[in-house]
Amino acid sequence: MIRRRGNVEIRVYYESVRPSRSRSHLKPSDHQEFPGHHVSPGSPGFPESPGNREFHDLPENPGSRAYPGTRDPHDPHGCPGSLDPHGNPAQPAGLPSPVPYAPLGSPDPSSPRQRTYVLPRVGIHNAPASDTRAPKRANSRHRADRPPESPGSELYPLNAQALAHLQMLPADHRAFFRTVIEVSRLCALNTHDPPPPLAGARVGQEAQLVHTQWLRANRESSPLWPWRTAAMNFIAAAAPCVQTHRHMHDLLMACAFWCCLAHASTCSYAGLYSAHCQHLFRAFGCGPPVLTTSRGQGGWCN
């Protein structure tokens, strides 16, 4: 029978047991089958038996020769364990007579006490606790501010939040920066196919236009001259040769870097450019502006 209490399982076993029977009905030879049985005084295993050689080798001790079944003639009252002349146990003087015990008889199979009865055994086991945890569910919904991951998820980090970044740029840089964001979002939606063939050329043309306007307004008077010159040289060389999304990604990041140089001390994308535009940081000695050099030098088209 099994009972449960919380996480504990109690099992009750029933075992058939017969009461022990008296050995008085067994033969003398049957006593040898039970270890620890008592031997009679006349048996070879008894210490006083004539067949026990170890007993005869012991030294005589007159004070230790009072054995059960004998009586000291000098002791009128007897000693415990001695027998009287009639063969009954002797009782020392001053002690009450022992209560006689009824002899053990042979077991009666018809007696209710001798019948087989059942003893229960109880075993406590730890029942296996059921798993109450809710099954794991795949989260198929993505956060609203994070697009689903794709093989090209490490590309095109410029997202919709960059539109708010527009308000921190000078007015003559905002149109070009908006074009960079739109092309970046368009390419990020379809990274399994090659980027649009005309997108790179369009970005390159607008970059040269805005850079020419900036040169006219800030010729040799801006501390950003080396870095913007390095960025525009890279853009002019890369725009005609865009073939993969990695090429498009590098081109767009260089364009965004060119725009954000206008507020380099407060730009929130500084960490982003540190990861993707390190090749533009060492701009000292980059050479003359791109408008005075031949197109295509130093790019992927060589």
UniProtKB/Swiss-Prot annotation:
GO cellular component: host cell nuclear matrix; viral tegument
Record note on modification: Phosphorylated.
Compositionally biased region (Low complexity): 40-50
Main location: virion
Factors inducing expression: Expressed late in the infection cycle.
unnamed zinc finger locations on the chain: 255-267
Top-level taxon in the UniProt lineage: Viruses
UniProt subcellular location: Virion tegument; Host nucleus matrix
Record region (Disordered): 1-155
An example molecular function term from Gene Ontology annotations: zinc ion binding
Keyword terms of this UniProt record: Host nucleus, Late protein, Metal-binding, Virion, Virion tegument, Zinc, Zinc-finger
Composition skew (Basic residues), residue ranges: 135-144
Cross-referenced InterPro entries: EHV_Unk
Residue stretches of biased makeup (Basic and acidic residues): 27-36
UniProt keyword Cell wall biogenesis/degradation present: no
Family statement: Belongs to the herpesviridae US10 family.
Name listed for the protein in its UniProt record: Virion protein US10
Protein species of origin: Human herpesvirus 2 (strain HG52) (HHV-2)
Gene assigned in the entry: US10
